[in-house]
Regions:
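Hydrophobic, aromatic-enriched interface-forming segments
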Residues: 144-151
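N-terminal catalytic or cofactor-binding beta/alpha core of small enzyme domains
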Residues: 1-140, 153-157, 174-192
Length: 192
């Protein structure tokens, strides 16, 4: 059976109440199942180098075939399934430890973009089928979400990323858990 790792990012300066990690932790407690894959979970520190390192260590420990990254976009009003990562990083946003990435590039020798081959369209449709607003996105930003997606795509081709909105009267934690579960189920179905 295939193994899917779901990783949620922890808090960072612009999102001290980042709902990504709590949503992933809730899924773990729910003991839900998906056909086609065994699921494991991890919380990633929102720290340069540590986020991809933690994800890769969890992938290895679990012998996972694929990973679904979940992060918050403080600017998003809907769920966004990312389709690519760019070799760029913000020079004005510090990580959770107050550090800045030392270069405008993630990898000085890497390609300008890395594309997601995971079933982004099916994941988007699955979220929409649950009555939530979701779209495909070709811009994962220039912070740790994009950074980690770019790094992981180099090591684990079956990496997907779901950006979730911040908590609001319109989007509560239950909605975010529903979206992550739907995306994970669609992703796992593609692994069969």
């Amino acid at each position: 059976m295939n193994r899917l790792l779901i990783c949620g990012f922890g808090p960072f300066p612009e999102a001290l109440d980042n709902p990504a990690a709590p949503a992933v932790e809730r899924l773990k407690l729910d003991h839900w199942a998906t056909s086609g894959a065994t699921v494991e979970y991890a919380v990633l520190p929102t720290v340069w180098d540590e986020a991809p390192k933690t994800a890769l260590e969890a992938l290895k420990a679990f012998s996972a075939h694929a990973v679904l990254l979940v992060g918050v976009s403080v600017h998003a009003e809907l769920f966004r399934v990312e389709t690519r990562a760019r070799n760029r990083v913000s020079q004005i946003h510090a990580d959770a430890q107050g550090r800045f990435w030392p270069s405008p590039l993630i990898d000085d020798n890497g390609p300008a973009e890395r594309f997601v081959i995971a079933p982004a369209q099916a994941m988007t449709a699955a979220i929409q089928a649950r009555g939530l607003t979701a779209t495909l996105s070709s811009d994962a930003g220039d912070y740790l979400c994009n950074f980690t997606l770019y790094r992981l795509l180099a090591e684990v081709p079956m990496t997907a990323f779901l950006h979730v909105p911040t908590l609001s009267p319109r989007i509560d934690l239950d909605s975010i858990v529903t979206a992550v579960r739907a995306a994970a189920q669609a992703f796992a179905a593609d692994l069969i």
